[in-house]
Amino acid sequence: MPSTTLPSSDVDLFATDTLVDPYPGYARLRDAGPVVRLDRYDAWALPRYEQVGAALRDHETFSSASGVGFGAGMNELMAGGVLASDPPHHTTLRVILSRMLMPRALRDLGPSVTVAAEDIVDRLATGAEFDAVSDLAEAFTPRFVADLIGLPQEGRDQLLEFGASTFEGLGPVGERTPAAMRQQKALLDYVTTTAARDRLVEGGLGARVWEAVDAGEIDEAAAITLMMAFLATGMDTTILSLAAAVRLFAQHPDQWDALRADPSLVPNAYLEVLRIASPVTVFSRVTTRDWECDGITVPAGDRVAVMYASANRDERKWGDPERFDITRKPSDHLTFGVGIHACVGQNLAKLEAHALLTALLARVRRFEIGKPEFIVNNTLHGLSKLPCRIVT
């Protein structure tokens, strides 16, 4: 039966406590309704799986062209990029990215990823304590992204800061916003100087972006936005998911034992990690026309919070959603999105994750972890630190 009252909530999606532990607040929003008014942000929230999926598939009603964040500054900076655009411009950018990042385009990268995964696991499987974030996930992922793009060695130490600041800046204006905006300007400077066209390695993804300019597919401004997208969104989500995998398997040793018994479950296990520990929590859209749900009308021109991480724990979709179960087969999780804005880099993320999990399976009997610490970021959730020891 449609709702007869306007559901609203005082849950603050961007309060520090929520960012560190978002799931209780998400559950309250799901219980409040399929569409919930967030008065403090003059926005609506879609916390349930069905409505999140519907919004992501309906780009004509839920537009990205006005930005996917909640603050005007970052939305203006990202305008016209692959995240913050609609067709036909988005289609042009997407075609260029897709042909670079499809599985067949990444096939040659596989052996080097496997070797690197085995090398890093060998170095950490000594019985000594290490940080699963900085020593494992952050030590593994950035090198592939940087090499794949063809970046010069200079300035690579800035890459992680670029990504975190982008996701931070997508939240509403707050005390951390100025630092995030400064990093965005530093990212633009990096792309136009340190990683300018004439400094990129021939044959890398960056050089191929500029080949699209030469072919008349895009202009130079679009090439810069694509380069910024590579650097801003190409690493953090994978890093966070890899660290989450270690935490989850340490906390659920029965699931690690099950994976060791049947390594063919690696792809499925990674999907379950992504479902239960979604690195990206929320983006926004703006409605282009009135949209009705459960008797509630969201007016045209309103901003809507599309809650990926909440949808992935929706009790209406998933049986016992708080349980980590590598046999669940959650192929329809929404961590990578769906529709025209589905994550174009998901094949690279899967390649890296599958290689690292496979390397860990070969050496690790169990993980012993200390107290996890979590990042504070407006649109990302995950670990900032995880003391860990590998038992072989």
Give the location of each predicted region.
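Cytochrome P450
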Residues: M1-T392
